[in-house]
Amino acid sequence: MIARCKGCSDLLPEDMLRFRYIESIFHDSCITWGYEEVRTPMLEYLSLFTSSGTLTPQMLKRVYSFLDWDGWSGERVVLRPDGTIPAARLYIDNLQEMEVARLCYTSNIFRFDETGKKSRENWQLGAEIIGVTGSEANAELITLALETLSRLGFEDVELRLSHSQLIKAVLAQLEPNADEQHKIFDQLLDGDVALMSRLEAEKPELFRTLKLLMENKGTSAAFLKNVMAMAGAAGGDLEEPLNDFIAGVDVLDKLGVSYQIDLASGKGFEYYTGVIFHLFVNGEHVGGGGRYDKLIPLLGGPDKPAAGFALYLNRLIPMIDAEDMYDMVEEKILIKYEGDNLKNAYEMANLIRECGISAELFYPGVDTAAYGWAVTVKAADSYEVTDLIEDKTTEFKNQAEVICLLSGEEDA
């Protein structure tokens, strides 16, 4: 038997039903907020992710890359490891005339995991707002994400906020190289005891500030003001990012959005330049995003600010209750026929489908338990409609009467 690749998943019919349900809720929310759907190719040039330094070396080690063979001049391409960078490239290539662009998409991303225990292909629902700076745009994205999760039936969604420049401002005093800053930050989050002991011994004031930022949590702008006061001179240039952060949470306060400030939740801040947010449902990380004002100019585009987020479909799918999808799932009708009535059966099925109801031809082996009704075409003027749940059969003489019953237009 040939097995599927390690780290890859098959999405079965029930999974895809949930997939489309989540996607439809997200898409409907985006459209009502003024976002327009786009789609980027699965293949992108590797240079899109390397020339601008938008991904860390650690992340680049996890991309699937290969040669796009074209004689001896082929370029190296990758299976996209990220959704935002291709969306930014799409804007630069096609939509620069738009002063403000609101874009949304569904995309799969690919990241190698040598253990095979983590998923190598992940589906994301993404939204980006390009050309708008400031806390109001950040709040719009956060509210859109929360609205989508609420419409999916999730209550008590946890919103965690961080700011990419806060940790960077402190780490810059320790290591000027940005890639090394990412590595050190990840080591600190992973609880690297040796690194923490070294920092405490060699740079005690810096270590104290890092602990202050990473261990304390708050739920208001006052918390951030206290951080500024407690960090003191050892905090480096924290004033500007803290003021930006305070402005952001002030907007959320006005909108009545609950949040937790968790400065240690900024892991993976490769191209982010401001506020970062993460979304959790029952402890499961289901989405996140932030501001990336330098990404578009880094990719060769205009100096446009931008921000965005992604919801993680693979993590949301198993969390959706089948009962939540009843409004989406249409009742299925089974179509049978007797004798030489195949054409009449097709006509009956098409009429039912025109009413927006699923109609399927019966074949031996079909499990009738999955259907609510069965229509048996006995002749052009003879039909039997069976309620498979109540086990009750009614006879009709024309198609219109059958349609009236199945569509609920009138009682039979």
Swiss-Prot record:
Record InterPro entries: aa-tRNA-synth_II, aa-tRNA-synth_II/BPL/LPL, HisRS-like_core, HisRS/HisZ, HisZ
Protein name: ATP phosphoribosyltransferase regulatory subunit
Function: Required for the first step of histidine biosynthesis. May allow the feedback regulation of ATP phosphoribosyltransferase activity by histidine.
Disulfide cross-links: none
Gene3D superfamilies (alphabetical): Bira Bifunctional Protein, Domain 2
GO MF: histidine-tRNA ligase activity
Pathway participation: Amino-acid biosynthesis; L-histidine biosynthesis; L-histidine from 5-phospho-alpha-D-ribose 1-diphosphate: step 1/9
Subcellular location(s) of the protein: Cytoplasm
Family statement drawn from the similarity comment of this UniProt entry: Belongs to the class-II aminoacyl-tRNA synthetase family. HisZ subfamily.
GO CC entries: cytoplasm
Biological process (GO), any one: L-histidine biosynthetic process
Keywords of this entry: Amino-acid biosynthesis, Cytoplasm, Histidine biosynthesis
Lineage: Bacteria, Bacillati, Chloroflexota, Dehalococcoidia, Dehalococcoidales
SUPFAM superfamilies per record: Class II aaRS and biotin synthetases
Additional information: This function is generally fulfilled by the C-terminal part of HisG, which is missing in some bacteria such as this one.
